[in-house]
Design a protein with these regions (language model features):
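Amphipathic alpha-helical segments of tetratricopeptide repeats
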Residues: 61-68, 104-109, 150-159, 193-204, ...
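"A position-specific structural signal for the A-helix of alpha-solenoid helical repeats
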Residues: 38, 42, 75, 82, ...
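Alpha-solenoid helical repeat architecture
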Residues: 71-78, 114-121, 161-169, 203-215, ...
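Amphipathic helix-loop-helix modules that constitute alpha-helical solenoid scaffolds
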Residues: 20-50, 87-159, 166, 372-414
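Single conserved hydrophobic/aromatic residue that forms the stacking wall/gate
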Residues: 2-8, 13, 415-425
Length: 425
């Protein structure tokens, strides 16, 4: 009896699961273009199998019109091939040989465009991966590798006979990510703004969720933050707020809310408005920081690192060390994210301040060994400063020490925003 009850319960769960999925698919088809096209193709196939060739062809034409309008190249390719299959099954009635050849040429053109778009997306994916999991370009080898990607992308653009929203979007995404990765923030901001204008002029072309639009807004904010243009940031943060008001998946909305907090917080911290930054944290402590597990790992790391920095600027060294301990306790989970390298540098300062000089020296060696290329100027400055501990006891001596370091700090803060570091593609 127990066994039969379990089987019945499992079947009930499966039936309910199917009902829920069917309802979600039906709701999705109302606003998702890809779902609408797929549904029309499915209807055409049903009509074709029922022997209603004319009706099937008409339904397929509607799907083809939608796919062409929204540049769904992969679906358009499948539709054109299906259309030829239907025509073949109907013995090409009412069609001349010239018309048949024209349809075949359309398939070839679509295939060529699909191949070019796929190569373009692959190049962008490689560049985006480097931006996510590697730091900014520092070595000649990295510079050459990045330039090779740029040349490949330019070659694709030059030989692409098709122009449209998707091509422009991918090209501007690639360029803006390239400039951001190479440290040319002014150029990155300019391209990102062009990309946002492209989305604004084509509101119906945004994905659900609008991942590429989000990448563009975050790219602008990252560039503005790096360039110290804090007064320009609220305008683009407001664009993130508008994304949370739309009917997008909850996971996407939670991610956007986290980035709204992060950029608002770092803007206030960099402006010296520490009290406002602390108040902002209190407003989000329950909704964001106590629900970190709902965020992806890279966002969790950024939020925890932000909390460490907030404690430091508010002169709460003990709380900063506790927050850093939570990051370190996570171990290798965060290791591959670029922000973890920043966390290690901040931890160096905390440990040196506590007098753990042996640990700090070993950590410096570990950080140096963890990269195949040389350390960045910021890392070298942190290493140099940590090795000055214990700091002089007198305020005068500390002032002299700061004067010696101040020039280097200022030079580093301006290095990326004075002149472009790479030629524009």
């Amino acid at each position: 009896e127990i066994g039969s009850g379990l089987v019945g319960s499992e079947m009930c769960i499966r039936d309910r699961y199917k009902v829920v999925v069917d309802c979600l698919l039906h709701l999705r088809s109302r606003y998702d273009i890809q779902a609408r096209i797929s549904n029309r193709m499915a209807e055409a196939e049903i009509l074709f199998r029922c022997g209603l060739l004319q009706a099937a062809t008409e339904e397929l034409s509607r799907a083809k019109k939608l796919a062409g309008q929204y540049e769904m190249t992969a679906l358009l390719m499948l539709i054109r091939q299906t259309e030829l299959r239907y025509l073949s099954a109907g013995d090409y009635q009412g069609m001349s040989e010239k018309q048949l050849v024209e349809k075949q040429m359309k398939v070839n053109e679509t295939f060529k465009h699909l191949r070019s778009a796929n190569q373009h997306m692959q190049l962008y994916d490689i560049l985006k991966y480097r931006a996510l999991y590697r730091s900014k370009v520092r070595s000649e080898q990295e510079c050459q590798s990045l330039n090779d990607l740029v040349l490949s992308e330019l070659h694709l653009i030059a030989n692409n006979t098709y122009n449209g929203f998707e091509v422009d979007k991918l090209h501007q995404l690639f360029q803006s990510t390239y400039f951001l990765q190479s440290g040319n923030y002014k150029a990155a901001i300019r391209i990102y703004q062009q990309l946002l204008e492209l989305f604004d002029h084509n509101p119906g072309r945004m994905l659900n969720p609008p991942l590429h639009y989000l990448d563009a807004v975050l790219g602008v904010l990252d560039s503005l933050l790096s360039a110290g243009l804090y007064d320009e940031m609220p305008f683009f943060i407001a664009k993130l707020h508008r994304l949370t008001e739309s009917d997008y998946p909850q996971e996407f909305v939670r991610k956007v809310l986290a980035f709204i907090y992060l950029y608002d917080s770092f803007r206030l911290i960099n402006c010296g408005a520490f009290a406002d930054a602390q108040e902002l944290y209190k407003q989000h402590e329950e909704t964001l920081f106590r629900k970190l597990s709902q965020q992806k790992l890279d966002v969790q790391l950024l939020l925890q690192l932000n909390l460490v920095v907030l404690h430091l600027v508010c002169d709460r060294g003990g709380e900063a060390r506790k927050a850093m301990t939570r990051i370190q306790a996570t171990g290798l989970v965060f290791y591959n994210f670029p922000a973890f390298r920043i966390a290690r540098l901040v931890n160096l300062l905390l440990q040196a301040e506590c007098g753990r000089f042996d640990f700090a020296e070993n950590e410096i060696k570990s950080i140096r060994r963890s990269t195949a290329i040389g350390n960045s100027s910021v890392e070298k400055l942190v290493f140099r400063f940590v090795r000055l501990f214990p700091l002089p006891g007198s305020r005068r001596e500390r002032g002299r020490l700061w004067e010696r370091l101040y020039g280097t700090v200022q030079a580093l803060s301006l290095i990326h925003i004075s002149e472009p570091t790479r030629p524009e593609p």
